[in-house]
Design a protein with these regions (language model features):
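Accessory interaction regions appended to the cores of large information-processing enzymes
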Residues: 1-110
Length: 110
């Protein structure tokens, strides 16, 4: 996995053989009721494999789990993903955990 901090958007890309996934997260100091979800379409011809609602569900579950384990709230403000990336959506639970764990241990050196 490769991690990036792009002006406060914490990003991870994962490529494993033919499978590929991208996730970008923006965090908030306070809980956010209406999380902004951006489904990026890289190619107009590429089918949308991922559903925004399901990706958001997995991201929020991953953030809740990590917040509980790390005893610190991680509130999601914005989610970015590529709509044509690989299934299953459950990978976004794990990608969220990976971003939060790295942010928790590396801080500004993310």
């Amino acid at each position: 996995m490769k991690f990036f901090n792009d002006n406060g958007i914490y990003k991870v890309s994962r490529i494993s053989g033919p499978l590929h996934n991208y996730l970008g997260l923006v965090f908030s100091d306070v809980p956010v009721a209406d999380v902004d979800v951006v489904a990026i379409k890289l190619d107009a011809k590429e089918p949308e494999r991922l559903r925004s609602k399901e990706v958001l569900k997995q991201v929020l579950a991953g953030a809740e789990h990590s917040s509980r384990v790390l005893s610190r709230p991680y509130n999601i403000k914005k989610v970015e993903f590529v709509s044509g990336d690989s299934l299953p959506e459950e990978i976004y639970f794990h990608l969220t955990q990976a971003i939060i764990e790295r942010l928790h241990t590396e801080g500004e050196n993310f």
